[in-house]
Amino acid sequence: MATGGLAIIQSMKHKLPPSERKLADYILAHPHKAIESTVNEISALANSSDAAVIRLCKSLGLKGFQDLKMRVAGDLAKPTFQGYRDIVPHEPLPSISEKTAGNAIQAIQDTSDLMDYKELERAVSLLLKAHTVHFIGLGASGIVAKDAQQKWLRIHKQATAFTDTHLVASLIANADKDDIVFAISFSGETQEIVELFAMAKEKGITTISLTQFSQTSVSALADVPLYTAHSNEALIRSAATSSRLAQLFIIDVLFLGMAAEQYETTTGYIDKTRAAIQSMRIK
């Protein structure tokens, strides 16, 4: 059963025009009524219009209202989570731990729900063929880029991950046509990342992006755009906790997808690197 309707709406809501946002808010608040309604009925319930319903489905990248209803129905058939929750002043650690675990589960589940597996398969195929993958990201996304680099190196795949934008520009300037530039940016609007990505496109280098689920400046430049769910990180937004976990989840899916395609070779490399690391431990 198709899922991800609620996650897609939540991810895109902040970029919708007012008439469509009103409908989105109604569907999020009353999902059971939404799946039982026709276009005319849902527009009346939300004090909107039939045309706005059609525009909303188009903005969400869906085939139509029936597609949206099927995805929302799939969401409602799954076990429910508590959603994203923020901490409060002087909150005890057990409560913080519970909320953090819940937010992590929600971010990964929402991201899984809106995955485009055809695009993921394209990404895996391109990454397997690439000579070198240049992961680029700033701030918390830079940490994810570093994680991706170490995973690639462990299976004998050439990869870089630098947060110095001048150094990245130099790498792109000298990159080969069979390299890939993989940009990681939750907002998809970080100026330096957009400029570096545009530089890669001008050179004819294949580009893959990982951004929030939305049409962004970075995803618009990507040959293969990949997405995470738009998590509601309110007060503690600067920590980028849920979005970072969702990004790491996608990197893991790509890594394991590559490993599955070249299973014997990959396990051989992992065994070698594990042995090398273990040999350096104090006995």
From Swiss-Prot:
Swiss-Prot/TrEMBL keywords: DNA-binding, Transcription, Transcription regulation
InterPro entries (alphabetical): Homeodomain-like_sf, HTH_RpiR, RpiR-like, RpiR-like_SIS, SIS_dom, SIS_dom_sf, WH-like_DNA-bd_sf
A Pfam family reported for this protein in Swiss-Prot or TrEMBL: SIS
Cystine crosslinks: none
Any one of the GO BP annotations: regulation of DNA-templated transcription
GO MF entries: carbohydrate derivative binding; DNA binding; DNA-binding transcription factor activity
Boundaries of every HTH rpiR-type domain copy: 3-79
SUPFAM superfamilies per record: Homeodomain-like, SIS domain
Domain SIS stretches: 123-264
PANTHER family, per database record: GLUCOKINASE, MURR_RPIR FAMILY TRANSCRIPTIONAL REGULATOR
Protein name: Uncharacterized HTH-type transcriptional regulator YbbH
Organism: Bacillus subtilis (strain 168)
Phylogenetic classification of the source organism: Bacteria, Bacillati, Bacillota, Bacilli, Bacillales
Gene from which the chain derives: ybbH
